[in-house]
């Protein structure tokens, strides 16, 4: 277990496997995570925020990046400003998803910049975003669910998808790749893919109805890697 902390809060990072998949960065008190394999592609910028380095208070301490949690708009905007300053992006160039656990993907351009942040979105039910336009910042949001980062260094395109258990069963990663193929001519063999921080199997208890969906969606040979049953009739899902 690894820890990062400021004067008020400690955050634990549980790493799976021997090699460090994620790097931890800090700039002026703002902490974020990144993948070294993607950092090596300097033409692409990415990051995954933590709770540290913002101005929000109490239960939202401190890097709250949601406008829907009861925080002031001023706090959220300042937090995004700090995160953008640390990582190196302009918050006004962000394009937000509208996550409802679908497998819907939206192709975005410079015309979409600011949607969800400084102006209204004209779309709903979008859990994945793709673009090939420089400067556009794809932005998705997470609690327990899995972020999927996709980079095409050949066609200079990127994708970012929110994969909860419903999206995983629905194979949103495949759908995102398919949309990149159709939109930009991407080839799966050229893509770099990274699975971001998410809830671990030890902490993710689900019921039988969820497992039944996974049994329907994945071949039996994968089941031992995906879940195991507990004495209480519940399952731990990976």
Please name every model-derived segment.
Residues 1-238:
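Active-site microenvironment for binding and transforming phosphate-containing groups
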């Amino acid at each position: 277990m690894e820890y990062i902390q400021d004067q008020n809060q400690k955050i634990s990072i549980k790493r799976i496997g021997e090699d460090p998949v994620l790097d931890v960065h800090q700039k002026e008190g703002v902490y974020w995570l990144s993948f070294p394999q993607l950092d090596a592609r300097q033409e692409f910028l990415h990051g995954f925020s933590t709770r540290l380095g913002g101005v929000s208070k109490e239960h939202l301490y401190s890097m709250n990046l949601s406008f829907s949690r009861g925080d002031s708009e001023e706090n959220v905007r300042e937090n995004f400003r700090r995160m953008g300053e640390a990582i190196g992006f302009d918050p006004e160039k962000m394009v937000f998803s509208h996550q409802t656990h679908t497998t819907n993907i939206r192709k975005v351009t410079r015309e979409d910049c600011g949607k969800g942040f400084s102006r209204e979105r004209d779309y709903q039910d979008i859990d994945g975003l793709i673009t090939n336009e420089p400067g556009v910042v794809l932005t998705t949001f997470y609690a327990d669910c899995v972020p999927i980062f996709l980079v095409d260094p050949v066609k200079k395109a990127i994708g970012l998808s929110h994969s909860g258990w419903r999206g995983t069963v629905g194979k949103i990663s495949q759908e995102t790749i398919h949309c990149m193929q159709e939109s930009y001519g991407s080839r799966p063999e050229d893509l770099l893919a990274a699975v971001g921080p998410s809830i671990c199997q030890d902490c993710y208890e689900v019921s039988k109805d969820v497992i039944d969906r996974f049994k329907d969606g994945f071949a039996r040979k994968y089941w031992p890697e995906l879940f195991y049953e507990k004495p209480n009739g519940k399952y731990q899902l990976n």
